[in-house]
UniProtKB/Swiss-Prot annotation:
Gene designation: yciU
SUPFAM superfamilies registered for this protein in UniProt: Putative dsDNA mimic
Pfam families cross-referenced by the UniProt entry: DUF440 (PF04269)
Source species of the chain: Escherichia coli O45:K1 (strain S88 / ExPEC)
Family that this chain belongs to: Belongs to the putative dsDNA mimic protein family.
Name of this chain's protein: Putative double-stranded DNA mimic protein YciU
Entry-linked InterPro entries: dsDNA_mimic_put, Put_dsDNA_mimic_sf
Length: 109
């Protein structure tokens, strides 16, 4: 995969893209009660956080997860408005290079 550092999604674009994907696929991949809980609580406690890809992604994909080009977005709920997300609904691995659309999701079970 040939990737260009000057053709990457910004951090905000990456978060927005991951959240859009989450919203589109959540109803098909989460328990209906979880979808309802997330929708009711997101305004007050919800969030999406951007990280370098965690090591355990290597159990799911077979390519190099260079943090210059790949990001993990965690979507879920926190105990408070400024708290860390501790109730994870999805972990989304995205390629930030605009010409390489790639997404893997680990859903809450």
């Amino acid at each position: 995969m040939d990737m260009d550092l000057n053709n990457r999604l910004t951090e905000d674009e990456t978060l927005e893209q991951a959240y859009d994907i989450f919203l589109e696929l959540a109803a098909d991949n989460l328990d209906p009660a979880d979808v309802l809980l997330f929708n009711l609580q997101f305004e007050e406690r919800g969030g999406a956080e951007l990280f370098d890809p965690a090591e355990d992604w290597l159990e799911h994909v077979d390519f190099d997860l260079n943090p210059d080009f790949f990001a993990e977005v965690v979507i879920g709920l926190a105990d408070s408005e400024d708290g860390e997300i501790n109730d994870v609904f999805a972990r989304i691995l995205l390629c930030r290079e605009k010409d390489h659309k790639l997404c893997h999701i680990i859903w809450r079970e």
